[in-house]
């Protein structure tokens, strides 16, 4: 009897997309790529969100705003990123704060992915699908977002300036094709390929 309660509490602790991945995506990928073992099936490992604030040198408050917005979007506090070397043309000193990033894993990762695909992406102006050319050759995908206001967590009236971000989806896929199929099965709205 207690085993049934444990499995029920485990299932309720999973994100909706994680359950969908296990029940629908894994069998579809096993059939498509003829995997012999379920452990060969690629999975989403982490999502890294990065906001660069180039004007943080002149206006330090912009970095605080970016940290606050990224905290609202991701649900966890981001790391402050500092410059590695000085570049005089950009008026940049070594060790100066220039951005922030956050890495999401497990439940938080699946919940963010679900919100990104179902709530944020449809709010992009003139959206015709995400580019399928942003794969890195190792099965990872990076999407550039030009406006942080596509996320429903951000209050448009309180945004001092529009800023963008990079969102990297790191998978265990061995090739870009496997990663493309994995992300497509999870609901990533790529542009339609012209075959």
Swiss-Prot record:
One GO CC term on file: ribonucleoprotein complex
Keyword flag Ribonucleoprotein: yes
Function: This is one of the proteins that bind and probably mediate the attachment of the 5S RNA into the large ribosomal subunit, where it forms part of the central protuberance. In the 70S ribosome it contacts protein S13 of the 30S subunit (bridge B1b), connecting the 2 subunits; this bridge is implicated in subunit movement. Contacts the P site tRNA; the 5S rRNA and some of its associated proteins might help stabilize positioning of ribosome-bound tRNAs.
Keyword Translocase recorded: no
Family of this protein: Belongs to the universal ribosomal protein uL5 family.
Any one GO molecular function term: rRNA binding
GO biological process, one term: translation
NCBIfam families: PRK00010.1 (NF000585)
UniProt entry keywords in alphabetical sequence: Ribonucleoprotein, Ribosomal protein, RNA-binding, rRNA-binding, tRNA-binding
Protein's name in the database: Large ribosomal subunit protein uL5
Domain of life of the source: Bacteria
One Pfam family it belongs to: Ribosomal_L5
Annotated gene: rplE
Subunit note: Part of the 50S ribosomal subunit; part of the 5S rRNA/L5/L18/L25 subcomplex. Contacts the 5S rRNA and the P site tRNA. Forms a bridge to the 30S subunit in the 70S ribosome.
InterPro entries found in the cross-reference section: Ribosomal_uL5 (IPR002132), Ribosomal_uL5_bac-type (IPR020930), Ribosomal_uL5_C (IPR031309), Ribosomal_uL5_dom_sf (IPR022803), Ribosomal_uL5_N (IPR031310)
């Amino acid at each position: 009897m207690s085993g049934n309660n444990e499995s029920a509490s485990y299932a309720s602790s999973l994100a909706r997309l994680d359950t969908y991945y296990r029940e629908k995506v894994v069998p579809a990928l096993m059939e498509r790529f003829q995997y012999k073992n379920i452990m060969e099936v690629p999975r989403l490992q982490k999502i890294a969100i990065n906001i660069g604030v180039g004007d943080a040198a002149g206006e330090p408050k912009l970095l605080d705003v970016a940290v606050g917005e990224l905290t609202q979007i991701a649900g966890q506090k981001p790391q402050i990123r500092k410059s590695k070397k000085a570049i005089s043309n950009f008026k940049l000193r070594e060790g100066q704060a220039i951005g922030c990033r956050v890495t999401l894993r497990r439940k938080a990762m699946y919940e963010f992915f679900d919100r990104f695909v179902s709530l944020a992406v449809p709010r992009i102006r003139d959206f015709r699908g995400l580019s399928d050319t942003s794969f890195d050759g190792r099965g990872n995908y990076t999407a550039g977002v030009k406006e942080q206001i596509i996320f429903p967590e951000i209050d448009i009236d309180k945004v001092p300036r529009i800023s963008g971000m990079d969102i990297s989806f790191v998978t265990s896929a061995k090739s870009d094709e496997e990663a493309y199929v994995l992300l497509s099965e999870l609901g990533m709205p790529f542009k339609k390929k012209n075959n």
